[in-house]
């Protein structure tokens, strides 16, 4: 790997990617890792699938109790679905059809483990529910069948697949235009569950032309629960990275999302922000489309929302936008984002602090004016405190932010970081297990040492003022130790730093690593310990 800023490239900023410590592929991988980590957390504030569980009223309680008794007895081996129920479902009597569909729906609404497999393994039942979806003359039957199918689709991928294979998706999309709001809402819910299952299911729903009717519904609906469900379904249509949805098929939702960001409902705001975070997660063309929709100022305002479930996805969206080029990053800065990010660095939520550091790290990977804006916002003192005290995953992001600033900053800006005490916490990172972060810390220290060398030449003193600071922070000992690191890039960098900035006066060639031609790696001799042991 090339050094972060080799002597021949001191004043050269690579324009093809945000962080000139890394090549473009590495930077892309870093952003993907962020996404994976987020998915692993199974975000508590957003479920990809939702089961519709009714609130039982007293009138229905006795019937439900009897039904539940029957369900409990099924655990002893008896089937919860009787032959009579199936016969009634296939009856020509619409009243019997409705009553039986309600029975199935109630079973499928039971928590915590509804008998989904038993229902889908009963021949013809799912197909019958799909058939009932077409009964425009009987909206109550449509609603009950849609509810039952929604709860089946809330299950495993295999269970969701059964609903798709029965041909439900195109009919659900037609029902988005139903004259009955309950039917519309249940159709939205079902489609959200199906789209939330996998990228394959998401793309199938998109290819069935869901977007226009869904956006029409979002534009016209005045029912809050409907709008909430529709925005949640929309966020599932935008979600996913491997692969992402075809951008042309989801980008038409941007104007609607822009309007929804001014809702006063936290649930709705959260899902709108998640949708925007998904849409902005990718190449600069996607980021530009999000910027052009006019959402940036409102997203920055929502960083200060008092509900964590809104501030978190707003931060993710803002963070994704600043992974773009310097001009795109500047759009966010022009919305007064830095005071908000400074505020978030003191959040009680570690995940928010980490995301804020990650966002700032992409701003400090920008141009010198942008680094200066971070300085002027008084953010670096807090970052350096985080670098010393926070959880490791947050310290990592703070390290990126500081090293990026040393990479692209002016001499004055780098001196400012040194004056804040950035050297010791960077030295402390040299002993961590994460090789990438060791490299980040080494790169930051190298940038500082390079500046010191330039200053010593200019002053004629011949003394690099930063070598002593690194030695005082036990950094030299740690860099020497890294010469035996298993990672080739780390031990080569450590050797180069020692040789160039801390070279011994007698220039003992025996200290240089030998090269193992067969293994294509350096071999470092183990230094002999003095008889009385090492004195640290």
Curated annotation (Swiss-Prot):
A motif (Nuclear localization signal) lies at residues 45-54. GO terms for biological process: entry of viral genome into host nucleus through nuclear pore complex via importin; maternal process involved in female pregnancy; positive regulation of cytokine production involved in inflammatory response; positive regulation of transcription by RNA polymerase II; positive regulation of viral life cycle; protein import into nucleus; symbiont-mediated perturbation of host defenses; transcription by RNA polymerase II. Only slightly detected in Ehrlich ascites tumor cells, thymus and skeletal muscle, clearly detected in kidney, spleen, liver, heart, and lung. High expression in testis. ARM repeats lie at residues 76-115, 116-159, 160-204, 205-243, 244-288, 289-328, 329-370, 371-410, 411-453, 457-502. The modification N-acetylmethionine is found at residue 1. Residues 1-29 are annotated as: Disordered. SUPFAM superfamilies: ARM repeat. It is found in: Cytoplasm. The keyword rRNA processing does not apply. Transmembrane segments: none annotated. Residues 316-404 are annotated as: NLS binding site (minor). Keywords: Acetylation, Cytoplasm, Phosphoprotein, Protein transport, Repeat, Transport. The modification Phosphoserine is found at residues 6, 113. Residues 1-60 form the IBB domain. One of its GO terms (molecular function) is nuclear import signal receptor activity. Its main location: cytoplasm. GO terms for cellular component: cytosol; host cell; NLS-dependent protein nuclear import complex; nucleoplasm. InterPro entries: ARM-like (IPR011989), ARM-type_fold (IPR016024), Arm_3 (IPR032413), Armadillo (IPR000225), Importin-a_IBB (IPR002652), Importin-a_IBB_sf (IPR036975), Importin_alpha (IPR024931). Residues 147-239 are annotated as: NLS binding site (major). Consists of an N-terminal hydrophilic region, a hydrophobic central region composed of 10 repeats, and a short hydrophilic C-terminus. The N-terminal hydrophilic region contains the importin beta binding domain (IBB domain), which is sufficient for binding importin beta and essential for nuclear protein import. The IBB domain is thought to act as an intrasteric autoregulatory sequence by interacting with the internal autoinhibitory NLS. Binding of KPNB1 probably overlaps the internal NLS and contributes to a high affinity for cytoplasmic NLS-containing cargo substrates. After dissociation of the importin/substrate complex in the nucleus the internal autohibitory NLS contributes to a low affinity for nuclear NLS-containing proteins. Forms a complex with importin subunit beta-1. Interacts with ZIC3. Belongs to the importin alpha family. Functions in nuclear protein import as an adapter protein for nuclear receptor KPNB1. Binds specifically and directly to substrates containing either a simple or bipartite NLS motif. Docking of the importin/substrate complex to the nuclear pore complex (NPC) is mediated by KPNB1 through binding to nucleoporin FxFG repeats and the complex is subsequently translocated through the pore by an energy requiring, Ran-dependent mechanism. This is Importin subunit alpha-7. The lineage of its organism: Eukaryota, Metazoa, Chordata, Craniata, Vertebrata.
């Amino acid at each position: 790997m090339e050094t972060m800023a080799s002597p021949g490239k001191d004043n050269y900023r690579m324009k093809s990617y945000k962080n000139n410590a890394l090549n473009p592929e590495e930077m892309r991988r870093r952003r993907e890792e962020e996404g994976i980590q987020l998915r692993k957390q199974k975000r508590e504030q957003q479920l990809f699938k939702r089961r519709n569980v009714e609130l039982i009223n007293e009138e229905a309680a006795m019937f439900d109790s009897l039904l539940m008794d029957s369900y409990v007895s099924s655990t002893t081996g008896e089937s919860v679905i009787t032959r009579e129920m199936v016969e009634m479902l296939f009856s020509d009597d619409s009243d019997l059809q409705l009553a039986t569909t309600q029975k199935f729906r109630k079973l499928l609404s039971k928590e915590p483990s509804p008998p989904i497999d038993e229902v889908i393994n009963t021949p013809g039942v799912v197909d019958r529910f799909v058939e009932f979806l077409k009964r425009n003359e009987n909206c109550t039957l449509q609603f009950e069948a849609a509810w039952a199918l929604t709860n089946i689709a809330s299950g495993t991928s295999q269970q969701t697949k059964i609903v798709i294979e029965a041909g439900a998706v195109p009919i659900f999309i037609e029902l988005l235009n139903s004259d009955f709001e309950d039917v519309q809402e249940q159709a939205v819910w079902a489609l959200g569950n199906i789209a939330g299952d996998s990228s394959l299911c998401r793309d199938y729903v998109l290819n069935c032309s869901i977007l226009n009717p869904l956006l029409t519904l979002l534009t016209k609906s005045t029912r809050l629960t409907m709008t909430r469900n529709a925005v949640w379904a929309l966020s599932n249509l935008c979600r996913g990275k491997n692969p992402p949805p075809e951008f042309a098929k989801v980008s038409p939702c941007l104007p609607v999302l822009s309007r929804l960001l001014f809702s006063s409902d936290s649930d709705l705001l959260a899902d709108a922000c998640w949708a925007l975070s998904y849409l902005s997660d990718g190449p600069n063309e996607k980021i530009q489309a999000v910027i052009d929709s006019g959402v940036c100022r409102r997203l920055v305002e929502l960083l200060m929302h008092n509900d964590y479930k809104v501030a978190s996805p707003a931060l993710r969206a803002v963070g994704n936008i600043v992974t773009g080029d310097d001009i795109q990053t500047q759009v966010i800065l022009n919305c007064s984002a830095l005071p908000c990010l400074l505020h978030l660095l003191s959040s009680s939520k570690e995940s928010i602090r980490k995301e804020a550091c990650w966002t700032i790290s992409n701003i400090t990977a920008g141009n010198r004016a942008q680094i200066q804006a971070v300085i002027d916002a008084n953010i670096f003192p807090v970052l350096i405190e985080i670098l010393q005290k926070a959880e490791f995953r947050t310290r990592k992001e703070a390290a990126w932010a500081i090293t990026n600033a040393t990479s692209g900053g002016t001499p004055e800006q780098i001196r400012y970081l040194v004056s804040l005490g950035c050297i010791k916490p960077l030295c402390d990172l040299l002993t961590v297990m994460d090789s990438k972060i060791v490299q980040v810390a080494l790169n930051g220290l190298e940038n500082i040492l390079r500046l010191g060398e330039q200053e010593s030449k200019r002053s004629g003193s011949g003394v690099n003022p930063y070598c002593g600071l690194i030695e005082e922070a036990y950094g030299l000992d740690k860099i020497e130790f890294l010469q035996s690191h298993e990672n080739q890039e780390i031990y080569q960098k450590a050797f180069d730093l020692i040789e160039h900035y801390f070279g011994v006066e007698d220039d003992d060639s025996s200290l240089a690593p030998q090269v193992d031609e067969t293994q294509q790696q350096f071999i470092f001799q183990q230094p002999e310990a003095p008889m009385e042991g090492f004195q640290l």
